[in-house]
């Protein structure tokens, strides 16, 4: 029943009003439902709401009530702000829009009053509130469902901890959150994920036609644990490479698998980001797909944001229809595009051609080079101009069988928030870090698996950590994780010799202070909760 979140959310609307969850300050201290009063709460609706917080702005569709005040609904989208905070701040993405907060992301000058960071913080804390509410009301009803909601809550807490470091923490809907350090949150997350694993469903790859598609199972738990362990040295000061490798290996050996066979003139990699990705074998790569449907599950801030926000009307990304742009009608917002540093990961000689995406990846000899260079410059000399920089044609609403989307405006493309490829690169990186900075034969094989899926060259000798840092970018650009990876490789804030165009607000790129590796606690949060203190440097 998950493919259409809305069917089950709408009956819960009255309940969300009781929750008072519009959370203008986004804190975790939201008024709970009193079960003695609200005896008709739709628990399935609340269960779905916990998942849907990552895919929808609020109750109803794209233009319905938003759960976060102070920004328009599309801007508060979970994926939109995951992208903005973790991609616009890095060597991958830049945006020329004038919305308040975009430039300070791009130039690494964000602070405690940043509207989009504060919106993402509110989105995460509101999602935690929904999970706490469900567990308080239905925690003993169904062990598997409760374990899933505990996972969703842990994922929200992970993102909050990764972004803001020292964060408000509570498991009760009615208590004022205490502040916990990153190291404390790490310890809680590790124990929580290990604790819920037995109650989660067995790891089983699924398509949208299978029961449970859109819900997490043991494999998602293993992948989040492997991510936690991979970043342990940043979070706690102590590395956990062996555990990262072990949990990544569990995912690799599960029934989830890399999509390796293309269809209908599309590559296997492209299929992961298309309008029928839940219906094709691409779905078997997704450990947590966020469901989208152009008719029933609509959002301005999820897949459509990554499709429309990266296209202008002159781009054509369909090799089978040279008049089509991106598979949605008249949704070409032309904002987010590549920094030259991303393109150079595929064209190290600065010789990226001016071609459409379906010819670009052939020239790159790598299916992941889904860039449009027609009439564009490689450099971002004029940040406000969309053609100043190569465009990204990675996300579309096209379908492998050539059929039309369910709706002209909104996308059917599910967003694969967790996918198997992460396990391969986690395994390889942990392997290299355990082996003096170069992969052993099994780590080499893990990188080769990722590269051969993309028809890129492979090797028999080792991959270095530098190679792996670049491979994270090639495989996952624009998927909302680059900031985390750069920090782990000491290439983000602080004095390091890794620069990119416009890093720190300088065209040539310059270092910025290490305190920016952690975002600022929103000012209004500090006012609302006396338990919180601001992060250092802000």
PLM feature spans:
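Long, intrinsically disordered, low-complexity segments
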Residues: 23-27, 40-43, 94-95, 124-125, ...
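Membrane-proximal, proline-rich intrinsically disordered regions
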Residues: 24-78, 530-538
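Conserved, well-structured interaction surfaces
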Residues: 44, 48, 52, 57-58, ...
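Flexible, polar/acidic helix-loop-strand segments at domain edges
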Residues: 97-119, 337-419
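Short coil/turn linking the two alpha-helices of tandem helical-hairpin repeats
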Residues: 161-168, 231-237, 435-437
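Extended ligand-binding clefts on enzyme/binding-domain cores
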Residues: 258-387
């Amino acid at each position: 029943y998950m493919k259409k979140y809305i069917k089950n959310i709408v009956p819960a609307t009255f309940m969300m009003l009781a929750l008072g969850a519009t959370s203008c300050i986004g804190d975790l201290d939201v008024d709970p439902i009193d079960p003695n009063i609200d005896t008709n709460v739709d628990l399935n609706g609340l269960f779905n709401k916990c998942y849907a917080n990552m895919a929808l702005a609020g109750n109803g569709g794209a233009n319905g009530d938003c759960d976060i005040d102070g920004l328009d609904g599309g801007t508060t989208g979970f994926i939109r702000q995951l992208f903005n905070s973790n991609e616009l701040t890095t060597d991958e993405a830049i945006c020329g829009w004038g919305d308040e907060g975009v430039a300070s992301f791009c130039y690494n000058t964000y602070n405690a009053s940043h509207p989009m960071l504060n919106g993402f913080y509110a989105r995460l804390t509101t999602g935690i509130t929904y999970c706490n509410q469900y567990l308080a009301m239905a925690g003993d009803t169904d062990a598997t469902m409760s374990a899933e909601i505990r996972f969703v809550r842990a994922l929200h807490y992970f993102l909050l901890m990764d972004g803001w470091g020292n964060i408000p923490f509570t498991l009760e809907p009615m208590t004022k959150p205490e502040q916990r350090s990153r190291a404390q949150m790490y310890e809680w997350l590790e124990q929580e994920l290990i604790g819920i694993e037995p109650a989660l469903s067995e790891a089983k790859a699924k398509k949208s036609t299978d029961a449970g598609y859109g819900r997490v199972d043991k494999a998602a738990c293993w992948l989040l644990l492997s991510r936690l362990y991979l970043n342990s040295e940043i979070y706690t000061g102590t590395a956990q490479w062996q555990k990262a490798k072990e949990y990544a290996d569990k995912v690799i050996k599960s029934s989830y698998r890399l999509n390796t066979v293309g269809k209908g003139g599309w590559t296997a990699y492209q299929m992961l980001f298309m309008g029928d990705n839940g219906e094709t074998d691409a779905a078997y790569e997704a450990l947590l797909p966020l469901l989208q449907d152009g008719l029933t599950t609509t959002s301005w801030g999820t897949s459509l944001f990554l499709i429309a926000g990266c296209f202008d009307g002159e781009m054509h990304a369909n090799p089978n229809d040279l008049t089509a742009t991106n598979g949605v009608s008249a949704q070409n917002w032309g904002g987010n595009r590549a920094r030259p540093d991303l393109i150079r990961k595929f064209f190290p000689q600065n010789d990226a051609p001016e071609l459409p995406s379906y010819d670009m990846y052939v020239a790159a000899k790598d299916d992941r080079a889904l860039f449009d260079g027609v009439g564009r410059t490689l450099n971002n000399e004029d940040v406000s101009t969309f053609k100043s920089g190569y465009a990204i044609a990675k996300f579309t609403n096209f379908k492998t069988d050539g059929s039309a989307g369910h709706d002209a405006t909104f996308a059917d493309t599910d967003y694969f928030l967790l996918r198997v490829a992460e396990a391969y690169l986690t395994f390889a990186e942990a392997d290299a870090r355990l082996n003096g900075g170069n992969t052993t034969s099994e780590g080499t094989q893990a990188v080769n698996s990722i590269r051969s899926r993309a028809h890129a060259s492979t090797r028999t000798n080792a991959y270095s950590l530098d190679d792996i840092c670049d491979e994270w970018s090639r495989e996952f650009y624009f998927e909302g994780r680059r900031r985390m990876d750069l920090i782990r490789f000491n290439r983000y804030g602080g004095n390091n010799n890794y620069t990119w165009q416009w890093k720190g607000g300088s065209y040539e790129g310059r270092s910025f202070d290490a305190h920016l590796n952690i975002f600022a606690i929103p000012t209004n949060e500090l006012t609302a909760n006396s338990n919180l203190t601001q992060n250092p440097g802000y």
